[in-house]
Design a protein with these regions (language model features):
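Expand to "…catalyze enediolate/carbanion chemistry for C-C bond making/breaking, isomerization
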Residues: 1-205
């Protein structure tokens, strides 16, 4: 209805193609089915507990999952094992996902949690940590490897070539990375420039 009304230039000429919803139960996932098809639907799941039932329900309606990897306080940042478990469940269920919150930076490290002067600091995941962990898991890496990737803080440990990305003696081919992008659809950042600037600074772009 929104898109029908706003299609006309007199009403803004805008089009919504993606929606995001928080869900806490499989029943809430099923209720979100009305958005699937009309929109690209991402359903944000809590990961304090095993999200398998939620991810399975998301697979059942053909939606995508969303995970929150940071927050405005240090205690809002999930543990690495929780993140890996989410990635594993998505892989097992064939569910694509996006990750958001705290992913302004390329690699894990201690950063300010907001842009405010004197903001509290916390140890955040980098977007490369999350995306590479998902890619390595897709080609068979176990949870131990994924945990180590999520904790990687040394840019020298990552080598980017035309046909591969290599990390500490293990590699993912470019074709496999492209395939992994169908699983790891996107990451969220408040800044468009920060991720690009950091990749340039690390000579990874």
């Amino acid at each position: 209805r929104f898109n029908d009304y706003h299609r006309d230039v007199r009403h803004g000429a805008v089009h919504v193609d993606t929606v995001e919803l928080k869900v806490a139960t499989p029943a809430e996932v099923v209720a979100a089915d009305e958005f699937v098809g009309a929109f690209d639907a991402f359903l944000e799941v809590p990961i304090d507990e095993d999200p398998d039932a939620l991810v399975a329900a998301i697979a059942g309606i053909g939606a995508k999952a969303k995970v929150r990897t940071g927050g405005l306080t240090a205690d809002a940042i999930p543990g690495a094992r929780q993140v890996v478990r989410f990635l594993r469940r998505c892989l097992e269920r064939g569910v694509a996902f996006k990750a958001t919150a705290g992913l302004h930076h390329a690699l894990r490290g201690e950063y300010a949690l907001t842009y405010d002067p004197g903001a509290p600091r916390g140890v955040l995941y980098g977007f490369l940590n999350v995306l590479l962990a998902a890619a390595f898991m897709r080609q068979g890496a176990d949870d131990g490897v994924a945990l180590a990737l999520l904790d990687e803080r040394d840019p020298a440990a990552i080598e980017v070539g035309d046909r591969f990305v290599r990390w500490r003696g293990q590699a993912v081919a470019a074709d496999d990375l492209r395939a992994a992008r169908h699983d790891a659809v996107a990451f969220g950042s408040c800044s468009f420039r920060e991720p690009v600037d950091e990749l340039h600074a690390l000579s990874l772009l």
